[in-house]
Amino acid sequence: MHNGRMRVLGVAFVGTATGSRAEMSAFVEDVLGLPRVEVAGVEADLYSLAGGARFAVSSPGGMGDTGRTIGFLVDDLDGALQELRAAGIEVDGQVGENAEHRYAHFRAPDGRLYELI
């Protein structure tokens, strides 16, 4: 439950968009040794990290115009989005959902796109 202050539990997602998706995915699998996972509703090559976090490799445009994004896991997504809006932060109007999470994007003061999960 949201208590008026956002509680970030950790980083649950890191993603990158690249024109070299096949090469990057091969590097992640073959050199870094990350196991690939399939999640319904995700249009990226998705890999499992320790602790349950995910790393995604997508084609250009798959991470917004910044090319990369980080997803912060919060205890109450809806409450955290209300808090961002109240602080004047630009929040994507749609809450997305895949087989694992509900999530929403926001643009931080540095101009980059981030995600709450």
Task: Identify the role of each PLM range.
Residues 1-7, 82-117:
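Vicinal oxygen chelate
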Residues 1-25, 68-70:
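N-terminal beta-strand motif that seeds the catalytic metal site of vicinal oxygen chelate
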Residues 14-17, 58, 97, 116-117:
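Short beta->alpha transition motifs characteristic of CBS
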Residues 24-31, 84, 111:
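Conserved active-site tyrosine of GNAT-family acetyltransferases
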Residues 32-39, 90-95:
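Short secondary-structure junctions
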Residues 34-67, 113-117:
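Conserved short beta-strand elements that form part of the metal-binding/catalytic scaffold
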Residues 43-45, 68-70, 100-104:
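Short beta-strand micro-motifs in enzyme catalytic cores
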Residues 66-84, 89:
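Mid-chain, well-packed structural core segment of small domains
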